Amino acid sequence: MSTEPTIHDSIDTAATTVGSLWPIHSFVTANPLAGFEDQPFSEAVTQAADLLGGRGYPSTRTFRAALQRGQIDPEILDAELSEAGYEKEPEILLDRMAEATDAADSDSDTATDHVDQVLTKWLSAFLDEGSAHWSMPNREAGFYAAFRGVAEHDSEIPDAGIIAELPESPIETIETVLASHPENQWVPIFEEQLAALPGWTGLIKQRADDEGAWQSTYPISLVGYLAARLALLDAVGAALAPSNDSIDPDPAAELAGAFLRAWEASYRGDLVETVAAESQSLADSDSSGRPDAQMVFCIDTRSEIIRRHIEATGDYETHGYAGFFGIPMEYQGYDTDVSVDACPPILDPQHHVTDVPIDDDTQESHDRWSGIRDTADEIIETLEANAATAYGFVETAGSGYGLALAARTLVPGRVQDLFDAAGRSVPDDHEFCDPLVHHQHTYTGDLPVGLTTDEKVEYAATAFDLMGWEAFSRLVVFTGHASETTNNPYDSSLDCGACAGNPGGPNARVLATICNDTEVQSALRDRGFEIPEDTVFMAGEHNTTTDEVELYDSEVPESHADDLKQLRANLATARENAAAERAESMGSDASSGVSETQRRAADWAETRPEWGLAGNAGFVIGPRELTSDVDLDGRAFLHSYDWSTDPDGEALEAILTGPMVVTQWINTQYYFSTVDNAVYGSGSKVTHNPVGNVGVYQGNGGDLMTGLPLQSLMAADDDPHHQPLRLSTVIHAPVDRVTDVLADHAELATLLDNNWLSLTVVDPTQDHHAFEYERDLEWSTVSEVSEADPAEPTATAVADD
């Protein structure tokens, strides 16, 4: 009887314990313990620690610093500790925690280490995405076949002939190696072997699931990888049987959990109090007039800072919406061969959109200058890589490279000014291209090119529904975001997570083009959206490193020139103030904010060009008025939502099943990268080595690093800038409506029941009382903002306090 189905099922089961890892050029922040989310958080981190070796809670030093800085409310901490059965002073308990977590390093298995060394060498060669000049032979046949072909020439394999003589089928190899092991051991064996190199196996898992161009051309699977690994282990005589040792409970875990809950409750309490108070004020206020402009930003925490400063400069209204602007598309820029997903990883692209030239003269200028630059780059690359010319080229050009290196190191700002000046001679794509959004009745791969009119109307209506829009200003700007860094392998981690680690400008341009379509506007008016004739939609992109907002104004008529001029001036002022705030957060002088952020963007020796989403801890779903007068310190995701325009709860359902899941991914990536950077992060950028355009090593080889670098999280050694807290979501809506959504989506309720994030609802229909989710769709009353109405607040199910 064939065991092939059992092997496949066992591998699929084991693979859930390894998080997917996206290539570094399109880095996606995701929960490294996503496969454990069906378990309570406390149990998940314990099992992950046993399998992967990572810590699940912040260190004693981190808790102590938070307590000293006032980030943990002493009364809340006392209550949490008492409930957990701890009666001693927090400082004494922290000392006890420190003693309990001191443990000896685990022993290393020499045979397994040797197998890891061999495999990582060939994995890096096989999975290379364009950086190697000489490719691994026979990659088209798949990893297992290619590995068999090169193994006999690898002197690091003790008996290479054994590998070369393996069966052609990877399943047969696995069957042979596991023949002496009962089937009930297969899943644990696969789990241990996948967890041995979680970076590489996470990349294989993601690549196989994605089925992109590289995977189609050079296929690899976990089956082929495990066949090669098991064969190597068998060849070196390594033991395969899983350990029977039971998991020793971490004696400090329960105590650390109490400290973590108190820290989270301290932050959440302040956030909920703010939202509840503003909810009361919002109910008592009259609607204002038509704003001078409306700007829609990504829900990204970095947007909170620039939005706050824009609103302070004039009569502007800002909104938060997922940064892909609701368009699940694959995007191909002008004159590029590669398409990228421009939507969250939890969605599959539904359309192919490309840039098409509309201005022949500007296109000609772009092509001419780009051609000169590309030709020069190609000549230099050829001279460097050719064995016959490399030495002479280095001898001739070395002094010039040395001067350039010194200039970029000592005066990066001036060098960047020169690059910018040269770059201005080459028009940007958006200056002569428009996104091809009209349906073309053709396909690129499996995706239709463009969008039908009905699809355009649906995407625009969905955006306005989710944000609760009822009025439109003369200018409406959809503003994507991107970062600007130099010599940074992790640059995509600073771009838009909702666009799968790519810039959000293209999505903003697509939605603006859709909304300017007269046929679309007519259909929107039929659906109740009163769009004035003088409303113009446009796109822009927020540079999160420098806080510059670039406006793409090709769609703006002369009648709106004064509006646009005023907006540009106010955006410049907002940039100065936001850049000052960011510079100060990085320990620099706030008075030189713009120049300092520009330097960080240009300096190739700068390991911290910006903080990214460090500090993220909250997600507020509700009208902007709830937070517009509050400094949230760039720590909260903000999604616009108006419960009064969403009677059936469909908009709320879309937000909870989409953006809330993505923000939880981001939050857990930052959490685990902070609490154990060696296992779940990627260590220091200073010692990173990029490999294959897919990831980085720490040092000169080994496993791919899976998370965020230290410089994105830590102000200094053992001093986190990011406060490692699980996400606190606050929703402004009737609590019964939220309960209905959770009841319809068990996966959301599971995340909450298992404490991967928290949820609080401020109910405007119940005198703005706040309700905190407990479990099993039950709620407890948190606070009472108004004493005017003595009626007891109610929810579908309210747990006893």
From Swiss-Prot:
Q: Which UniProt keywords apply?
A: Cell membrane, Membrane, Metal-binding, Plasmid, Transport, Zinc
Tell me the GO molecular function terms. Answer: zinc ion binding
**Residues given in the record as Zn(2+) binding sites:** 298, 300, 481, 496
Q: Quick check: keyword ATP-binding in the entry?
A: no
Highest taxon above the source species: Archaea
Locations listed in the record:
Cell membrane
Keyword Transport carried by entry: yes
Cofactor(s) this protein cannot do without: Zn(2+)
Q: What segment(s) does the record annotate as region Disordered?
A: 575-596
> What's the protein's topology in the membrane?
Peripheral membrane protein
Q: What is its main location?
A: membrane
Give any Gene Ontology cellular component.
Answer: plasma membrane
Which protein family is it in?
Answer: Belongs to the inorganic carbon transporter (TC 9.A.2) DabA family.
- What does it do? Part of an energy-coupled inorganic carbon pump.
Assembly and binders? Forms a complex with DabB.
Q: List the PANTHER family hit by this protein, alphabetically.
A: INORGANIC CARBON TRANSPORTER SUBUNIT DABA-RELATED, UPF0753 PROTEIN AQ_863
Q: What is this protein called?
A: Probable inorganic carbon transporter subunit DabA
Tell me which species this is from: Haloarcula marismortui (strain ATCC 43049 / DSM 3752 / JCM 8966 / VKM B-1809)
Q: What is the lineage of its organism?
A: Archaea, Methanobacteriati, Methanobacteriota, Stenosarchaea group, Halobacteria
> Which gene is transcribed and translated to give this protein?
dabA
